[in-house]
UniProtKB/Swiss-Prot annotation:
Protein name: Lipid droplet-associated hydrolase
Effect listed in the UniProt record for changing residue 301 to A: No effect on cellular triglyceride accumulation
Native organism: Mus musculus (Mouse)
Protein family according to the UniProt entry: Belongs to the AB hydrolase superfamily. LDAH family.
Enzyme Commission number: 3.1.1.13
Gene behind the chain: Ldah
Length: 326
């Protein structure tokens, strides 16, 4: 029955200019423009998902739909793509933002870590009215961006921020980071050249076929196209952002956490190569009064591939002010 309900959930893919960059937004629910009167009543809250890297927004659709259903269709759930992680298809239009002036100014180094944070701020200012409360959900490096969005724009009406598998410190020292750092920082240009040679001349229909085969082998059902994952432009930007993560995300920003602690919930994995249990233990020690949880369900860092329903259930319980079932 749940799957039948989720099939009926309206999901749309839209493209906007944000900080001078074409940006994909996936919207779950009947609301398209929160500034305009529509056939449905204006929601009081918006659930806004900031993905990880290379967390292409299409991967988060099952999670968004599950969360939308668990919240009884009361609030829209939106997923923003990172700057440079999507290419607008030829059959799609780049739409005007409700508050266009917020998106007119280009962002310096928009594909880098700082630029990506400013990119999210520009979108929220242009698309979300001040009387709509925000429920921010960050995943992986999206948690780092979430914290810094809150720090830089204090007037944002953030009700809650849920930080899933938070990569907010010592990324290059983590088990995965020790491998990824030399690859992303020293061999990034080799990846650029390889992806350009392999995929630039490749027709879109062939890319779609390759992705369908790969997703089929991984038993992943995609509801929206994912050809961006084989676009050299997008791959290069994902690698560039990753290289900056390894270099810049080092010391945990305790000042931000202290300032917003009552609004924050952290969820760590037991076998997470990006934020190991030691990081969880340090957080619990330094912030004993915080809402900091360690997963007991075996949910992996890349939960969007197989555990969307389980993760959505936990987040829905948080939103409804119930302690999560570990």
């Amino acid at each position: 029955m749940a799957s039948e309900v989720e099939e009926q959930i309206p999901v749309r893919e839209e493209f906007f200019l944000c900080g001078g960059v074409e940006t994909k937004i996936i919207k779950c629910g009947p609301w398209t423009n929160l500034f305009e009167k529509q056939d449905v009543s204006k929601p009081k809250q918006l659930i806004f998902i900031i993905p990880g890297n290379p967390g292409y927004s299409a991967f988060y659709v099952p999670f968004a739909k599950a969360l939308y259903t668990l919240m009884k269709s009361r609030f829209p759930v939106w997923i923003i793509s990172h700057a440079g992680f999507s290419v607008t298809p030829k059959d799609k239009k780049v739409l005007a933002a409700p508050q266009e002036e917020s998106n007119a100014q280009k962002i310096e180094d928009v594909y880098g870590l700082n630029g990506q944070i400013e990119h999210k701020i520009a979108f929220l200012r242009a698309h979300v009215p001040k009387d709509v409360k925000l429920i921010l959900i960050g995943h992986s490096v999206g948690t780092y961006m979430t914290l810094h969005v809150m720090k830089r724009v204090l007037e944002l009406p953030v009700a809650h921020a849920f930080l899933l598998f938070p990569t907010i410190e010592r990324m290059s020292e983590s088990p995965n980071g020790k491998f990824a750092t030399p690859f992303l920082c020293q061999f990034r240009y080799l990846l650029y050249a390889t992806s350009y040679l392999l995929f630039k001349p490749c027709p879109e229909v062939i890319k779609s076929f390759i992705i369908q085969k790969l997703m089929g082998q991984m038993n992943i059902k995609l509801e929206l196209p994912l050809t961006d994952i084989l676009q050299p432009f997008c791959l290069a930007n994902a690698a560039y952002l990753g290289s900056q993560e390894m270099v810049q995300i080092v010391k945990r920003d305790d000042d931000i956490i202290k300032e917003f602690l009552p609004k924050l919930k952290f969820y760590y994995g037991k076998t997470d190569g990006w934020c190991p249990v030691k990081y969880y233990e340090d957080m619990k020690k330094d912030f004993p009064e915080g809402n900091i949880y360690l997963c007991e369900k075996g949910i992996p860092h890349a939960f969007v591939l197989d555990f969307s329903q389980e993760m959505a259930t936990i987040v829905a319980e948080w939103i409804n002010n119930r302690p999560p079932r570990k």
